[in-house]
């Protein structure tokens, strides 16, 4: 793998992980579009690179959200130390809600690994998911924000639903942030609050998936430079994606992302149908 390819894929992963456009879908489409075959048939090496990019993205996003992460960890730990004799309130309740969202996502992830191992490799399905979930994102985001709820206003059953929705993103093209933003907006969560919720929900899932996959990863000596460069590119672009989306949603909606998904999906299907790629 060239350093240029590593930089491009790192930037693509970091930017699209938190924008509602599907990072896994883009990581399949970009090499397919340009005819890159950096890994050949070595699926284990490709998965190792994917883990590196996700861990880079995790570092960038965690750094950006560090005050929120520390705040909710402290609140949750304080509630646990108090003996959990009373129902959590405020930040402690939000911390518990975030923890609950990770459970169904983790269970679905383990089921995917145990039954199929990998849901990628079908470009037509990635394109279809981009279109379908792009339309759903547009529909969900049309909700009026004047009665918007905060994270703390969600119920624990809402948290389970959000976690299940996040689990759908194991299929490339769905988008973890896109599907959870759609559900959060359907649950009447205010737009910027929904984005912050989605980012915080994703951190333990990305970390858990990365650690689980890292246990089975072996990186050949000659591959360390592109792995490190890709990870750094993903960290920087992941930080930037969180920053840009939060600023953007303070002023406008998600319609532009929905339109991009639909156009990209139909573009890929057209290339497939005409035999260009």
Which residue stretches match the model-derived regions?
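Multi-pass membrane proteins that catalyze or facilitate reactions on polyprenyl-/lipid-phosphate substrates
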Residues: 1-277
């Amino acid at each position: 793998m060239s350093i240029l390819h590593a930089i491009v894929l790192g930037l693509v992963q970091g930017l699209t992980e938190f924008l509602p456009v599907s990072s896994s879908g883009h990581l399949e489409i970009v090499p397919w579009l340009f005819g890159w075959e950096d890994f050949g048939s070595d699926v284990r090496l490709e998965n190792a690179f994917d883990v590196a990019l996700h861990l880079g993205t995790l570092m960038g996003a965690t750094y950006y959200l560090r005050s929120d992460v520390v705040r909710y960890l402290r609140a949750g730990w304080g509630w646990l130390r108090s003996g959990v004799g009373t129902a959590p309130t405020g930040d402690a309740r939000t911390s518990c809600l975030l923890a609950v969202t990770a459970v169904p996502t983790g269970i679905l992830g383990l089921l995917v690994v145990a039954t199929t191992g990998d849901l990628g490799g079908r470009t037509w399905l990635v394109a279809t998911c981009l279109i379908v979930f792009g339309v759903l994102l547009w529909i969900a985001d049309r909700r009026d924000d004047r009665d918007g709820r905060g994270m703390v206003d969600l119920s624990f059953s809402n948290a389970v639903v959000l976690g299940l929705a996040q689990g759908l993103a194991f299929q490339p093209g769905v988008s973890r942030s896109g599907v959870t933003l759609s559900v959060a907006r359907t649950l009447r969560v205010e737009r910027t609050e929904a984005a912050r919720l989605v980012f915080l929900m994703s951190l333990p899932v990305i970390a858990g998936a990365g650690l689980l996959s890292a246990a089975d990863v072996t990186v050949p000596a000659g591959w360390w430079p592109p792995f490190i460069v890709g990870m750094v590119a993903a960290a920087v672009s992941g930080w930037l994606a969180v920053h840009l989306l939060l600023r953007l949603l303070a002023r406008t909606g998600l319609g532009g992302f929905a339109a991009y998904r639909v156009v990209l999906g139909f573009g890929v299907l057209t290339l497939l149908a005409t035999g260009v790629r």
